[in-house]
Amino acid sequence: MGAQLSLVVQASPSIAIFSYIDVLEEVHYVSQLNSSRFLKTCKALDPNGEIVIKVFIKPKDQYSLRPFLQRIRAQSFKLGQLPHVLNYSKLIETNRAGYMIRQHLKNNLYDRLSLRPYLQDIELKFIAFQLLNALKDIHNLNIVHGDIKTENILVTSWNWCILTDFAAFIKPVYLPEDNPGEFLFYFDTSKRRTCYLAPERFNSKLYQDGKSNNGRLTKEMDIFSLGCVIAEIFAEGRPIFNLSQLFKYKSNSYDVNREFLMEEMNSTDLRNLVLDMIQLDPSKRLSCDELLNKYRGIFFPDYFYTFIYDYFRNLVTMTTSTPISDNTCTNSTLEDNVKLLDETTEKIYRDFSQICHCLDFPLIKDGGEIGSDPPILESYKIEIEISRFLNTNLYFPQNYHLVLQQFTKVSEKIKSVKEECALLFISYLSHSIRSIVSTATKLKNLELLAVFAQFVSDENKIDRVVPYFVCCFEDSDQDVQALSLLTLIQVLTSVRKLNQLNENIFVDYLLPRLKRLLISNRQNTNYLRIVFANCLSDLAIIINRFQEFTFAQHCNDNSMDNNTEIMESSTKYSAKLIQSVEDLTVSFLTDNDTYVKMALLQNILPLCKFFGRERTNDIILSHLITYLNDKDPALRVSLIQTISGISILLGTVTLEQYILPLLIQTITDSEELVVISVLQSLKSLFKTGLIRKKYYIDISKTTSPLLLHPNNWIRQFTLMIIIEIINKLSKAEVYCILYPIIRPFFEFDVEFNFKSMISCCKQPVSRSVYNLLCSWSVRASKSLFWKKIITNHVDSFGNNRIEFITKNYSSKNYGFNKRDTKSSSSLKGIKTSSTVYSHDNKEIPLTAEDRNWIDKFHIIGLTEKDIWKIVALRGYVIRTARVMAANPDFPYNNSNYRPLVQNSPPNLNLTNIMPRNIFFDVEFAEESTSEGQDSNLENQQIYKYDESEKDSNKLNINGSKQLSTVMDINGSLIFKNKSIATTTSNLKNVFVQLEPTSYHMHSPNHGLKDNANVKPERKVVVSNSYEGDVESIEKFLSTFKILPPLRDYKEFGPIQEIVRSPNMGNLRGKLIATLMENEPNSITSSAVSPGETPYLITGSDQGVIKIWNLKEIIVGEVYSSSLTYDCSSTVTQITMIPNFDAFAVSSKDGQIIVLKVNHYQQESEVKFLNCECIRKINLKNFGKNEYAVRMRAFVNEEKSLLVALTNLSRVIIFDIRTLERLQIIENSPRHGAVSSICIDEECCVLILGTTRGIIDIWDIRFNVLIRSWSFGDHAPITHVEVCQFYGKNSVIVVGGSSKTFLTIWNFVKGHCQYAFINSDEQPSMEHFLPIEKGLEELNFCGIRSLNALSTISVSNDKILLTDEATSSIVMFSLNELSSSKAVISPSRFSDVFIPTQVTANLTMLLRKMKRTSTHSVDDSLYHHDIINSISTCEVDETPLLVACDNSGLIGIFQ
């Protein structure tokens, strides 16, 4: 712009700089970035974000910038294609100034060097590598930058470098050596006096000769400047030259190697790299390409060249756009780029196996060696095995396994891990996580960060990864919050070293954030709190370990004199930590949600260890013992399963005073699973020796009656406890003390081991006996059997002993002894009826009431000699039953009761409430609102197709007419027509015709904008017989969706009579007609209406539907179509609506239309009027570019369904009546694309065949996949059809094996019944065994069978199919397999089929070729193109076969 420009430019502008910006359209001035005299740099906003504007204020109005701007524009256009360059996107000249505009980035390289976290060595190397590649690309375009410095190198948040502010046409090439003012004016805009210019650019002679602008910049000048930049970044921001040092260096009076490089750089390779770039002689400076080749594998790691750089360059190009021709920028907006980071994160996730291979991460192939080549895309799994709860599975598209280890262990073996190259990916992922839109992608990002964190040092784990996990605590999605918490703990678990800056990370940073996370989620769902509670103990372990690290470092770094100070600070820090963890623990212990408490209990032992014995007693145990009274038995079970471990930690005193008495009381819990857990815990405590001998006898007396309990687990654990006690006692103690207690419960004396004792235990009482005993204990009133004796005896746990009345005791105190008048009066009116004996031969008196109960026991199977068993269980049952009695939901009287872990549902008292029947009536609105009732009756009579309606007007016994027949549609009751109202004395069941209570608007044209040619929608009125005024009931009744059956919809026409399937056994294969009207357009689908007037429907790839009158064609009267309908798009499928003159058509534009064929009888001829569109829907409303490729229709009194398979392998089910979408079934993509479908005769089962040879069986009632299998060589399955001849559970499968025509399977049992082999060689039986496991791991056959079948048709016991290669048609006879034959074949060979019984369940039909004639075959009688569709029908009792091929030819065979 002129060598002497510095002399004429104003020292300061006459007006404020923002006034120059205001003249620009759609630009808002923000601030001024520098105060340079040459170019004023401002920050502004435009519609697409922040921009930088460099303003050149013209020294005079006539000063023209056009030649400069043209050259800058041409240069920017070339540079716009490079990912390392940020060019000027807009250049503007006004009469006062020139403007160069580009995008604004926050940081340049100079700023980044001083920001935390500081760049690591591998990142500095990668930045230098990027800059050399960027400069190489620029020089390859014959462009020179001219002003490379750290301020002109922009850096993204993940350290991708971008060169900007090219100065070749803006600033002078040469500067005077004696005037530093020129350098300050043009190049020292930051006023740091740092010089990056090559020494040869300071040349006074060339400057004075006027070549400062006309001189040519050289590539060597850029190399020198870049060498200065690389030296500065490795010197932690210290510049290699200022202006005076550069002059000294030029005069050889400054030794840069000794005075700078040796001081700042330890690496000899780095020093040599810089020296090769800053040589005084430009010719000795190496080019970028030479530098990269020379230092490959020496200074720059080899994986920079082979993988890393290219991979990140691809990521950059994914997030940017390339300018179109003649433009320097694109108009990409922020809205367009909102999901770009989602795409790049997904790419890293998909490419993880490739990343591991290229960086030598310890990736192990499942069943293979380290680093082996990946197989074809299947499944990839990473298992994190560092922490107890973090055995997380990450799924990637490769079949590999990664065992993550501590950094120190891996870095010793692998160079790339030691260099921490994973930091490059961590920088990218961590800075993108907050801008990711999709929750699923954000979860993948967290998983990747957790995995990559294992390959960086402990310091970088904390500084570079942990903050981003913590920032995800603020995310609105609980899945993200929970996974961020899990990954945080996982990463911290592997940390083994701490630096001084991170010593207080928990107190100052993590714990306050965790508390805030917990508080902020109080009002949300419990998922996060459950995860947090489960992780708390692991967090406590990490905190404890960090404390140990900190203390050890202080002891090593300080002298003994400072030990007191260290101890004090450590004590304060520990107190804060313990208090914070205590607050979190109490919060979880007192949480309102049971599952949060259970999650804490699952891993509470490390937390107890963290607090120590005293604090555990005060904080944890005091809360835990209250859980035994909780209503939720699952919580009680969790506590009891944990309590034995806590007991070991707390010791015998706490066990005997608190824990053991509570466990003994809990043996009588109402839930048997709780009792099992108690017995299991007692067994563990006995085994560890924590329970002293003084408790053995009382525990034996309490538990030994449980050997008669009906629960098998309770009996076994009771026996295990007895065996543990026996092992702890001496032989004398066993036989003198324990043996008398347990002997009654065994048949005979045995050895004291589990196997012997379990085999000779007395038979337990049955469940019905036990439940009746519980019921008796609660309901007993005048009973001596349950009468307890008041006693002051207590056992060793402080519980009162239970003693019952015996005959001796009652005789002494109640029956004959008059001294105890108080006790006698309490039994007044009670008379003994008989006695029973206990297991210790004591007589127990019974009252008459007791005797009645005993008789009940006899009735349910308890013999008289086994009555002692219920006597022995009295003490246990009376405690258990009292607990049950406190629970109003417990079913005492149900003899079939089986206890469950979960609480029983609320027991509503329905004793005096009778069920109420509510009837629904449904009719079309125009019928219900019409004034003339006669016309309604007429219409109803026209559409009476159900035989049950014929007797609907018969009189009942009382002479009144019966109500009309009620039918069941979708689980609700409706009337077929109105009847005269009746009265009855039972007001709960009266039906009265009410006014319409709700209108169900069902549009048959859902989702369409243009419905001009579609039948208008019809309103349906639904009324019910409810006469009450309870709002909740009325609201509930209004939720029922009731529709009339399809036969009541007039637009579908009258229902056809059931026409039997044609008898194809008489088919001879004679060609009687050839229709060529459709040539050369391919016929893609066809169908035949089987009614009284059979007609053929064909659809072509041009979207034309044609209707053909088969009767007239056979007679020879016409050979053209009767009707034509244009669908405007390729027809993919035609399917008939059963029992109606209507059919459904799907096309590639996403449309599904239902057409009705209108025709009438004129004398003996049938005249076709038109095709009327009665329903229409567009699948593009549900999915982009989606259309149906297969359809099936099903109609009965309850359902009218249209099942459509789309090109996206989704199955969509519609209601034919309204074309409303009912459900979507999405099959697993791992099973392959769905290629064929069929439904069973009850429309409950959907059968899918896939391109990977897998058969999937779905229950469409519950949208559940119930079975999948493959067989053979897994060839693609092209057709599946229901085979009713062999039963409702049989399905015909074409495909799966390249050796068969087809196979017939029982899809319920999953075995092959028949196999139709396409050769005379019998395959192995294993070929037809179902493979149900490991379907995703099978090697699938990607090609179809050589004898591929193009289409199939099933008619009763006949299966007709076409051979794609020969266009022959084969007919298999299921009734007589040996009579199967090729009915239409152009070959000189005939097929002979030989049935072979292989097993009782499998029959094979082998095909054998046999020459039939030596004469030539008349080719005109056969199809010469692929047959796309075949159909069968019967006209005047003559079976017909209609075949339509790819050339548009229709052949009719008789």
UniProtKB/Swiss-Prot annotation:
InterPro entries: ARM-like, ARM-type_fold, HEAT_type_2, Kinase-like_dom_sf, Prot_kinase_dom, Ser/Thr_kinase_AS, Vps15-like, VPS15-like_hel. HEAT repeats lie at residues 460-497, 576-613, 615-652, 654-691. Keywords: ATP-binding, Autophagy, Endosome, Golgi apparatus, Kinase, Lipoprotein, Membrane, Myristate, Nucleotide-binding, Phosphoprotein, Protein transport, Repeat, Serine/threonine-protein kinase, Transferase, Transport, WD repeat. Pfam families: Pkinase (PF00069), VPS15-like_hel (PF22956). Changing D147R: Loss of activity. GO terms for biological process: autophagy; cellular response to potassium ion starvation; late endosome to vacuole transport; macroautophagy; pexophagy; phosphatidylinositol phosphate biosynthetic process; positive regulation of transcription elongation by RNA polymerase II; protein retention in Golgi apparatus. GO terms for molecular function: ATP binding; protein serine kinase activity; protein serine/threonine kinase activity; ubiquitin binding. ATP binds at L33, N34, S35, S36, R37, F38, L39, K40, T41, K54. It is an enzyme of class 2 (transferase). The keyword Repeat applies. Changing E200R: Loss of activity. No activation of VPS34 kinase activity. PROSITE patterns: HEAT_REPEAT, PROTEIN_KINASE_DOM, PROTEIN_KINASE_ST, WD_REPEATS_2. The keyword Repeat applies. Autophosphorylated. Serine/threonine-protein kinase required for cytoplasm to vacuole transport (Cvt) and autophagy as a part of the autophagy-specific VPS34 PI3-kinase complex I. This complex is essential to recruit the ATG8-phosphatidylinositol conjugate and the ATG12-ATG5 conjugate to the pre-autophagosomal structure. Is also involved in endosome-to-Golgi retrograde transport as part of the VPS34 PI3-kinase complex II. Belongs to the protein kinase superfamily. Ser/Thr protein kinase family. Component of the autophagy-specific VPS34 PI3-kinase complex I composed of VPS15, VPS30, VPS34, ATG14 and ATG38; and of the VPS34 PI3-kinase complex II composed of VPS15, VPS30, VPS34 and VPS38. Interacts directly with ATG14 and GPA1. Interacts directly with VPS34. This is Serine/threonine-protein kinase VPS15.
